[in-house]
Amino acid sequence: MSEISFVTVTALTKYIKRKFDVDPHLEDIWIKGELSNVKIHSRGHIYFTLKDDNARIQSVMFARQNRNLAFTPENGMKVLVRGGISVYEPSGSYQLYAKEIQPDGIGALHLAYEELKKKLSQEGLFDEKYKKPIPAFPSVVGVVTSPTGAAVRDVITTIKRRYPLVKVIVLPTLVQGVNAGESIVSSIEEANRRDLCDVLIVGRGGGSIEELWAFNEEAVARAIFSSDIPIISAVGHETDFTISDFVADLRAATPTGAAELAVPNMLDLLERLKTLEARMTKSMQQDLKKRQERVKNLQSSYAFRYPKRLYAQKEQEFDLIFDRFQKQLAMTVDRKKQKLNEQTYKLEMLHPEEQLKQARKRHEEQTVRLKRNMKVQLKQIHSQFQTVLGKLNALSPLQVMERGYSLTYKENELIKSIEQVHEKDEIRVTLNDGTLTCEVLQKRGETNG
């Protein structure tokens, strides 16, 4: 009987999990169903069961995926869920790891719309204080829309008709379908990153709520709010507003209306210039007439008829001012003289003879102190000198010689050993009181007795 091969539960579960993970059909899949057993964890994770009439699957959506969720999942909602299927090893059950949840059906879309509208309004994304002004005379207008739809043709035609000087840049964008929101966000970010235009039109032609839903996505709303370029929302829906309409700096009911808001009308500008020119001409003529009348009045005035009298009064005023100046100058000189006399008196009070007497007294006192200090210091130096001299004399060879010792030299070299001399050598013996020249008759060391 052959030996049976066993596997552990863990190994089997891991094997099955790998089968799920490598299956391309289960890696990214859309599933339609009804929510039940919805539980929102304190950390933000959402646990729920997705079911239909015949089956159910355990599901989880982690907090990092549900941050942009446009509505709050509740039991009984019909939804479309995108995610991947894998095995939860501890229980050995397969489950759905959700990445995206969308309401299924128009009623659910309206619910999601209202919840997102409330959320963004509370955050302040709709506040007027954040609205950027639309430039009056843009040089470049950017258009975020489908490059093949009627909307882009209407926008370009309207802009060129109204204001031919402007340049139009179209950023080809998906405006309908699953990836439309991501495409709109990408185009807005590209326009800002490259600083492509002065104003941006974001929109499309009309359609159903499902077709316009991309303009109700939170990511699109936040991209519009974060844009440095002013944005005109142009979703072709006369009565209903999209979330993008609330966030945009300006809302137009149609793409054509957005084009009219984005650029001025050249004909209107020309007409306005003509009106301003006529108004300015009339104003200048009126002003010129007033000035001419004023000149006439001046020419007939008293001053022009008697010009000398015009400055006679001024001459008199000048004389009065000059007299006051001279008086003021004399008073100033007198004050300076008085102050000088006071200073002179103070200097005379400080007699130089007294100052010299005090200086001599201080000099004599300092001289006495200096002599006394010098005597003390000389006495100390003499005492130190005698001490050092005594020490030097104690070490001097002359002092040693006074006690009966002598120094013996051979050819000016001091003899320290009998090995330095030989018999018949001439040596010089220095005593305390003189020098002897001697001849060596005999050498005898200590060993010779």
UniProtKB/Swiss-Prot annotation:
UniProt GO cellular component terms: cytoplasm; exodeoxyribonuclease VII complex
Recorded catalytic activity of this chain's protein: Exonucleolytic cleavage in either 5'- to 3'- or 3'- to 5'-direction to yield nucleoside 5'-phosphates
One GO term (biological process): DNA catabolic process
Major localization class: cytoplasm
InterPro entries in the cross-refs: Exonuc_VII_L (IPR003753), Exonuc_VII_lsu_C (IPR020579), OB-fold_nuc-bd_dom (IPR025824)
Subcellular location: Cytoplasm
Source superkingdom: Bacteria
GO molecular function, one term: exodeoxyribonuclease VII activity
Assigned keywords, A-Z: Cytoplasm, Exonuclease, Hydrolase, Nuclease
EC number(s) reported in the record: 3.1.11.6
NCBIfam families attached to this UniProt entry: xseA
Protein name (Swiss-Prot/TrEMBL): Exodeoxyribonuclease 7 large subunit
